[in-house]
UniProtKB/Swiss-Prot annotation:
Pfam families the UniProt entry points to: Ribosomal_L32e
Record's GO cellular component terms: cytosolic large ribosomal subunit
GO biological process terms on file: translation
PANTHER family assigned to the protein according to its UniProt record, in alphabetical order: 60S RIBOSOMAL PROTEIN L32 AND DNA-DIRECTED RNA POLYMERASE II, SUBUNIT N (PTHR23413), RIBOSOMAL PROTEIN L32 (PTHR23413:SF1)
MF annotations from Gene Ontology: structural constituent of ribosome
Family membership noted in the UniProt record: Belongs to the eukaryotic ribosomal protein eL32 family.
Cell membrane in keyword set: no
UniProt protein name: Large ribosomal subunit protein eL32
InterPro entries attached to this UniProt entry: Ribosomal_eL32 (IPR001515), Ribosomal_eL32_arc (IPR023654), Ribosomal_eL32_CS (IPR018263), Ribosomal_eL32_sf (IPR036351)
Originating species: Methanococcus maripaludis (strain C6 / ATCC BAA-1332)
UniProtKB keywords: Ribonucleoprotein, Ribosomal protein
Domain of life: Archaea
SUPFAM superfamilies per the UniProt record, alphabetical: Ribosomal protein L32e
Length: 135
């Protein structure tokens, strides 16, 4: 378990050091968004990797393989649409994220059942959970 915690801490440190990858020349025109596109230009300093240019997304920026894709709490993130899907979750290694398309009534049911089963719901705040449980 200590190895897992070490990797989670390493993942957090790597995330903090990871630069914000932005599209080449994103600041020159408002029509060009900031979302990442790989530079392909023949004379592109960014593509070549000149030190005074912005960072290019490469394999070296990836986090540790064992904890890649996990929630910062260390639990696996499972998307839930209804109570039936919630029952299939293992609370020791998985947590629930309620889908955006779920309405308030079903959301309340899911939160109540999750509390009963001891499952953590990632996208509902503690304050909202208490409010839902009191209904």
């Amino acid at each position: 378990m200590s190895e897992f915690k070490r990797l989670m801490r390493l993942k957090l440190k790597m995330k903090q050091k990871r630069p914000e990858f932005k599209r080449q020349d994103w600041f020159k025109s408002s029509r060009i968004g900031t979302s990442w596109r790989r530079p392909f230009g023949k004379h592109s300093g960014m593509r070549i990797g000149l030190t005074h240019r912005a960072a290019v997304a490469t394999v070296g920026y990836r986090g540790p393989a064992l904890v890649r894709g996990l929630h910062p709490s260390g639990l696996q993130d499972i998307l839930v649409n209804n109570v039936k899907e919630l029952v299939a979750i293992n609370p020791e290694i998985q947590g629930a994220r309620i889908a955006a398309t779920v309405g308030k009534r079903k959301r309340i049911e899911i939160v109540k059942k999750a509390n009963e089963l001891g499952i953590r719901v990632f996208n509902v705040s503690k304050q909202k959970q208490e409010e839902f449980l009191s209904l």
